Amino acid sequence: MFNMNINSPVRFVKETNRAKSPTRQSPYAAGYDLYSAYDYTIPPGERQLIKTDISMSMPKFCYGRIAPRSGLSLKGIDIGGGVIDEDYRGNIGVILINNGKCTFNVNTGDRIAQLIYQRIYYPELEEVQSLDSTNRGDQGFGSTGLR
């Protein structure tokens, strides 16, 4: 299967002196908080790419998932995109979307998102003429009901 040492450190670089190291707020937190390296203003209904000035190498067979922070979600702030591929080595940016009614200010050093490391599988794709049937079939959005 996967030959991955879970005790191997993940290497990262602070690209500028404005960068702050990713941190976990508790020993069992799923994600590492990412910090803004700059000040930004995001008007209602707008989005902004927030630079962390951090670059890192993902562990083999892993990718980084940028996830929202619950406290920001309560304020109407969401994440756009959010995948860091195993072979990406550039500045990690986070797209913040302001779904709120007020302007949202991001200050240097604010926690803006969390980075969660997840295993990934690279399957070989095979085109076929049809798929095996299931009870659900092609029933999609809302088809399983609310209860």
From Swiss-Prot:
Q: Which UniProt keywords apply?
A: Early protein, Hydrolase, Magnesium, Metal-binding, Nucleotide metabolism
Task: Give the induction note.
Answer: Expressed in the early phase of the viral replicative cycle.
Does this entry carry the keyword Magnesium? yes
List the cofactors: Mg(2+)
Q: What class of enzyme is it?
A: hydrolase
Note the SS bond partners: none
For this protein, the record's Gene3D superfamilies field holds: 2.70.40.10
Which reactions appear under catalytic activity for this entry? dUTP + H2O = dUMP + diphosphate + H(+)
User: What GO biological process term is on the record, naming one?
Assistant: dUMP biosynthetic process
| One Pfam family, short name | dUTPase
InterPro entries referenced in this protein's UniProt entry, alphabetically: dUTPase, dUTPase-like, dUTPase-like_sf, dUTPase_trimeric
Tell me the residue numbers annotated for binding dUTP. 68-70, 82-85, 88, 93, 95, 111
Q: What is its EC number?
A: 3.6.1.23
Q: Is-annotated flag, keyword Endoplasmic reticulum? A: no
Q: Which GO terms describe its molecular function?
A: dUTP diphosphatase activity; magnesium ion binding
Q: Where does Mg(2+) bind?
A: 24
* Function according to Swiss-Prot or TrEMBL: This enzyme is involved in nucleotide metabolism: it produces dUMP, the immediate precursor of thymidine nucleotides and it decreases the intracellular concentration of dUTP so that uracil cannot be incorporated into DNA.
Give the family this protein belongs to, as stated in its UniProt record.
Belongs to the dUTPase family.
Q: What is this protein called?
A: Deoxyuridine 5'-triphosphate nucleotidohydrolase
From the broadest rank down, the organism's phylogenetic lineage runs: Viruses, Varidnaviria, Bamfordvirae, Nucleocytoviricota, Pokkesviricetes
State which gene encodes it: OPG046
